[in-house]
């Protein structure tokens, strides 16, 4: 069956992928022929996710490495999977429930809601898997993992318990990013900075105890004060006046002469009446604002740091919904008598409270002024609501105790991070690490394996000493309501059975009948109080200890998704079970990831794997850059410059998208992606297809079979292309081994399009009518086979389709052996001769183009001087040179005729007479005018780029564009100058 005229990507891609899957082509160990393993873990996309350009880029690079190793016979596993994406998934399901008019999460309860989440996951959670298949990702989908799979849950809970028991996990109060919409702590990665128009309010805080000071109000030219006024207040500036209710200090710089003598004194907080100290801290900048900074440790990360250094209290004045929490807040009222106006703010939304505080400040005379201010405000990336720094009780990993092995592993080379600059980022983060908040106030996720009970130990009741609670003692305990005020006590265990044993051990030390109580699980503290009181009341009636219960309730929070995904390498391979896969594929070979999650994911995987199994999770981390638009701008919906990879695949085919991303994947350099580039690489695929059709028309595929070794060749052209094939194989392998994906792609592009399609196909045409025809068919078939094999990791679809169409194959291309030949195939004589021929043709073509010789016009050429090797090469290839350089014939002369253009090649020179062919004077004038305009433009660009202010202040993409234009202009200028120089030789 003859080949189609063109490759139909839309039809072929689904058909070929289905064939690969049916053949088990991607399963772990498929095509393995050597003992070495290669394992790579997919960075698990969110189960809610859809394929974006970052996914497409990342997974293209992973697939290239996977297919390359699989074809080389490695026991290969590309482990796929999805992250349960706690907050994102919960948001999606809640939105779906609301859209369908169903009860909300809180109305239906936790268990019913989680059932709905699992239903959604089964119905809609596989979207990104199918999209990755469209890209051509050759993952072992039979092993597709999910971070909420039963085995993964066991791994996560086991690690939590182990780290807790080692003292690496603790519960404490710290400042966190709080999303008031979802009412949960979120990670820094889930926070986006939004620039907003706002105000800077200046507030006056009265000095306590009648204190005053001299404040400078006028200055000379050198900034020295010349006039002062007596003040009994300090002025502070804030963009968030509502937080002043939680102020616990004023910070001034210890070197600030205006305030140095006030350090240690106090001010009285307006509305609240709280006396707060003036403290010294370098955070206060004398050159900014008034130099005095209000400190609210519970609602600002910088203020928290000041508070920790200076011993200030932290008073939270907001609820989880970002409403003011004042009246029933003992921290707020402690040590002061808030005014009625302050207490009236209780329950107000933070923004309403802001308006009211400003109004009160103006009414009462402590508003010093208002300045318009444009500043950055952190927002939740999903809720789009302003984040509130919030002091809350959370679970933390004491990362300082487990971080050092992760630092040492990279420093000693157990794990290599590429490029090197990202290793520096890794070290910077880990060497300045803070405790990691791992609890989230969500329902979807790994519920924290901690249970709480009421502290009813001896301090909570009175026993007459007989080690038994009698009826009166129990009655007094119930009547006293001690349970309502009992502190919680807690234990951590893998499951309820394990935690029950720990609570039973505690109960054993209590008086009878409490020491006989059964541990039962309830939903909340309130239910625990009721159940315990009811059980004791019943015991007083029937004295049957078998009915006595001690209720415990589980921590409702779930773990940060980065905690579970931090176990991705070992969890997907079966840990904590000692599976064959874990023994065979761990540690994995390489992780390919984006720079934005080096800390959030990569560093945490390093820390956790080393803490849990004392092994690094991967030997290499390759950090790729961002995919930007063609102007270098970050893609965003607001800019309207987002390129959808699925739409690009629909339009250009997956191979073109993949090759574009690969060819532009220079290590550490962002990609500037354009549809024009993708279209160009689609044309590259078409070029290969057409070369195979040319081969078909010349009988190359008749009886053709796969041959590892090249055919024996005598024709110079065939010997030359066989050597070039050996060279490019070595180049590709060296590039991929060093993660220089762009070098591999560009080497293949230059070889397939340039050497094979442009030169070899043209050189071979005359040979099909000679005695070298059979040899040429065999050589062309072998060379095109190698093109398919070498291109397959980057362009899997078109190469697999060509492979099946162009001969009798014993197995699919995906499992065809990768070649091992190399530069030993190079024939020096053939290489030298054909390189000389190509150089001569290219020089003639370039000269013609530079001076605008009409493309179809055949010119005479004069041989001036030529060594013996050149004469032999010319004699053997004269017909080729005349045809491909569009020449009418060669003559020989001692010197160049008048009006001729000279061309130098190795071993000699030639001349092309141009008199009467072009108007040399007019052409020189045209070139000079074009060059003059170009040089003027280049001078402007050099001036801009030489201006430090432009380079420092202009957007990065604008500077990059200017540099690119200058580089392109300089290249064009060099070509124009060369053309002028050629014409000057003639005149």
UniProtKB/Swiss-Prot annotation:
EC numbers: 6.1.1.9
Annotated InterPro entries: aa-tRNA-synth_I_CS (IPR001412), aa-tRNA-synth_Ia (IPR002300), Anticodon_Ia_Val (IPR033705), M/V/L/I-tRNA-synth_anticd-bd (IPR013155), Rossmann-like_a/b/a_fold (IPR014729), tRNA-bd_arm (IPR010978), tRNAsynth_Ia_anticodon-bd (IPR009080), Val-tRNA_synth_C_sf (IPR037118)
Keyword tRNA-binding assigned: no
Gene3D superfamilies noted in UniProt: HUPs, Isoleucyl-tRNA Synthetase, Domain 1, Valyl-tRNA synthetase, C-terminal domain, Valyl/Leucyl/Isoleucyl-tRNA synthetase, editing domain
GO cellular component, as recorded: cytosol
Location of this chain's protein in the cell: Cytoplasm
Cytoplasm recorded as keyword: yes
A Pfam family the protein falls into: Anticodon_1
Catalytic activity, reaction form: tRNA(Val) + L-valine + ATP = L-valyl-tRNA(Val) + AMP + diphosphate
Disulphide-bridged cysteine pairs: none
Keywords per UniProt: Aminoacyl-tRNA synthetase, ATP-binding, Coiled coil, Cytoplasm, Ligase, Nucleotide-binding, Protein biosynthesis
GO terms classed as biological process: valyl-tRNA aminoacylation
Subcellular location, principal: cytoplasm
MF terms in GO: aminoacyl-tRNA deacylase activity; ATP binding; valine-tRNA ligase activity
Residue interval(s) of motif 'HIGH' region: 45-55
Chain span(s) of sequence motif 'KMSKS' region: 634-638
Coiled coil: 917-985
Complexes and interactors: Monomer.
Family matches, as NCBIfam families: PRK05729.1, valS
Known role: Catalyzes the attachment of valine to tRNA(Val). As ValRS can inadvertently accommodate and process structurally similar amino acids such as threonine, to avoid such errors, it has a 'posttransfer' editing activity that hydrolyzes mischarged Thr-tRNA(Val) in a tRNA-dependent manner.
PANTHER family: VALINE--TRNA LIGASE, CHLOROPLASTIC_MITOCHONDRIAL 2, VALYL-TRNA SYNTHETASES
Entry's family note: Belongs to the class-I aminoacyl-tRNA synthetase family. ValS type 1 subfamily.
Record-given protein name: Valine--tRNA ligase
Species: Cereibacter sphaeroides (strain ATCC 17029 / ATH 2.4.9)
Encoding gene (name): valS
């Amino acid at each position: 069956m003859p080949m189609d005229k063109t490759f139909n990507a839309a039809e072929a891609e689904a058909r070929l992928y289905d064939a690969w899957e049916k053949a088990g082509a991607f399963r772990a160990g498929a095509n393995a022929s050597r003992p070495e393993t290669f394992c790579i873990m997919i960075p698990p996309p969110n189960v809610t996710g859809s394929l974006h350009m970052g996914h497409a880029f990342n997974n293209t690079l992973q697939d290239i490495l996977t297919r390359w190793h699989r074809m080389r016979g490695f026991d290969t596993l590309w482990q796929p999977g999805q992250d349960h994406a706690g907050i994102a998934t919960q948001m999606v399901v809640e939105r779906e429930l609301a859209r369908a008019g169903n009860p909300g999460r809180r109305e239906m309860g936790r268990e019913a809601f989680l059932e709905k989440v699992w239903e959604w996951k089964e119905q809609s959670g596989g979207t990104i898997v199918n999209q990755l298949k469209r890209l051509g990702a050759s993952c072992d989908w039979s092993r597709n993992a999910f971070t909420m799979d039963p085995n993964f849950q066991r791994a996560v809970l086991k690690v939590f318990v182990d780290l807790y028991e080692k003292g690496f996990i603790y519960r404490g109060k710290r400042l966190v990013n709080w999303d008031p919409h979802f009412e949960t702590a979120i990670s820094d990665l889930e926070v986006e900075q939004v620039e907003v128009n706002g105000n800077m309010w200046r507030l006056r805080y009265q000095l306590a105890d009648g204190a005053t000071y001299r404040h400078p109000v006028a200055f000379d030219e050198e900034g020295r004060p010349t006039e002062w006024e007596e003040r009994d207040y300090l002025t502070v500036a804030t963009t968030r006046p509502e937080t002043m209710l939680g102020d616990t200090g004023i910070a001034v710089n210890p070197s600030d002469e205006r305030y140095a003598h006030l350090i240690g004194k106090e001010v009285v907080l307006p509305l609240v009446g709280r006396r707060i100290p003036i403290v010294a801290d370098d955070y206060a900048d004398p050159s900014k604002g008034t130099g005095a900074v209000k400190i609210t440790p519970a609602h600002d990360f910088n203020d928290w740091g000041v508070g920790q250094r200076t011993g200030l209290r932290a008073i939270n004045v907001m609820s989880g919904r970002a409403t003011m929490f004042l009246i029933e807040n003992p921290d707020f009222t402690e040590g002061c008598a808030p005014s009625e106006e302050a207490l009236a703010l209780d329950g107000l939304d933070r923004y309403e409270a802001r308006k009211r505080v400003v109004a009160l400040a103006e009414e009462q005379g402590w508003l010093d002024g208002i300045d318009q201010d444009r500043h950055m405000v952190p927002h939740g990336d999903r809720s789009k609501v302003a984040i509130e720094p919030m002091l809350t009780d959370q679970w933390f990993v004491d990362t300082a105790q487990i971080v050092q092995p992760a630092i040492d592993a990279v420093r000693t080379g157990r794990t290599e991070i590429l490029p090197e600059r990202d290793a520096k980022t890794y070290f910077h983060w880990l060497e300045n690490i803070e405790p990691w908040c791992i609890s989230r106030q969500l329902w979807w996720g790994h519920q924290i394996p901690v249970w709480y009970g009421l502290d009813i130990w001896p301090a909570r009741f009175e026993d007459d000493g007989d080690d038994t609670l009698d009826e009166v003692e129990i009655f007094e305990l119930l009547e006293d309501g001690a349970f309502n005020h009992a502190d919680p006590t807690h234990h951590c265990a893998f499951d309820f059975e394990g935690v029950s044993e720990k609570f039973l051990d505690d109960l054993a030390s209590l008086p009878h009948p409490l020491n006989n109580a059964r541990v039962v699980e309830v939903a909340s503290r309130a239910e625990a109080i009721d159940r315990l009181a009811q059980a004791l009341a019943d015991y007083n009636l029937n004295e049957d200890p078998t009915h006595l219960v001690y209720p415990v309730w589980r921590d409702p929070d779930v773990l940060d998704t980065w905690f579970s995904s931090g176990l991705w390498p070992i969890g997907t391979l079966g840990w904590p079970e000692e599976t064959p896969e874990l023994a065979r594929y761990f540690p994995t070979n390489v992780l390919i990831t984006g720079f934005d999650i080096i800390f959030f994911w990569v560093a945490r995987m390093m820390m956790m794997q080393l803490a849990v199994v004392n092994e690094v999770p991967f030997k290499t981390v390759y950090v790729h850059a961002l995919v930007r638009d063609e102007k270098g701008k970050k893609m965003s919906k607001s800019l309207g410059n987002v390129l959808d990879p699925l739409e690009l695949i629909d339009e250009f085919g997956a191979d073109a998208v993949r090759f574009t991303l690969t060819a532009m994947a220079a290590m550490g350099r962002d990609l500037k992606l354009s549809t024009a580039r993708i279209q160009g690489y689609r044309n590259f695929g078409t070029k290969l297809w057409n070369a195979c059709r040319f081969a078909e028309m010349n009988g190359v595929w008749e009886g053709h079979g796969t041959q590892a070794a090249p055919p024996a060749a005598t024709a110079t052209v065939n010997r030359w292309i066989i050597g070039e094939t050996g060279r490019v194989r070595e180049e590709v392998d060296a590039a991929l081994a060093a993660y220089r994906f762009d070098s591999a792609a560009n080497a293949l592009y230059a070889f397939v399009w340039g050497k094979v399609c442009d030169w070899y196909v043209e050189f071979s045409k005359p040979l099909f009518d000679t005695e070298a025809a059979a040899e040429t068919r065999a050589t062309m078939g072998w060379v095109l086979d190698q093109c398919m094999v070498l291109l397959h990791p980057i362009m899997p679809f078109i190469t697999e389709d060509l492979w099946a169409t162009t001969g009798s194959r014993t197995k699919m291309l995906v499992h065809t052996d990768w070649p091992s030949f190399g530069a030993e195939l190079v024939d020096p004589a053939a290489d030298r001769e054909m390189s000389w021929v190509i150089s001569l043709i290219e020089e003639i073509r370039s000269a013609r183009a530079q001076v605008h010789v009409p493309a179809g016009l055949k010119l005479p050429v004069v041989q001036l001087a030529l060594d013996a090797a050149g004469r032999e090469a010319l004699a053997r290839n004269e017909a080729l040179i005349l045809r491909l350089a569009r020449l009418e014939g060669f003559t020989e002369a001692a010197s160049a005729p008048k009006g001729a253009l000279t061309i130098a090649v190795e071993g000699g020179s030639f001349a092309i007479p141009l008199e009467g062919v072009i108007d040399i004077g007019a052409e020189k004038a045209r070139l000079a005018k074009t060059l003059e305009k170009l040089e003027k433009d280049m001078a402007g660009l050099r001036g801009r780029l030489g201006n430090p202010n432009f380079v420092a202040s202009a957007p990065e993409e604008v500077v990059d564009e200017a540099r690119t234009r200058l580089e392109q202009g300089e290249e064009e200028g060099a070509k124009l100058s060369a053309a002028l120089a050629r014409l000057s030789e003639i005149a």
